[in-house]
Amino acid sequence: AYPPVLGVDQEGGYVSHLRGIATEFPAFDAAGVAISADGRSGREVVRQAAYATGLELRDLGFTWVFAPVADVTIGAADPTIGTRSASEDPAVAAKATAAAVRGFEAAGVVSTAKHFPGHGAATSDSHDTLPVLE
């Protein structure tokens, strides 16, 4: 028998739907800061945070997490992705995303990296309107 597929949006930061139930980790931009400061140990910190999150999710019955955000941000003009992205630098964002996915996987949780490439360049919130990227 297979366990039920139960997913949750638990990125850290303000997209944490288990507030008060699970450990509150910072937004994913902290992962980029850690990796930029020290690549090897930064990636391990990111992996361990995702692993800890994954273990808590498994304990709560979740088998799937909608995280991490793999897209890059354009910074303050980006109302949707912003601090949910590890970095404006694609290489840093890729390293952070890979480390997080490995951590979730090690905890036995399926990870969905999101959002569509380029979403971080949108200047309107996709929850409110259809962004147009040029």
Question: Each PLM stretch: what is its role?
Answer:
Residues 2, 87-110:
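Alpha-helix-loop-beta-strand connector modules within alpha/beta enzyme cores
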Residues 1-93, 115, 120-134:
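Enzymes and membrane/adaptor proteins characterized by extended Gly/Ser/Thr/Asp/Glu-rich
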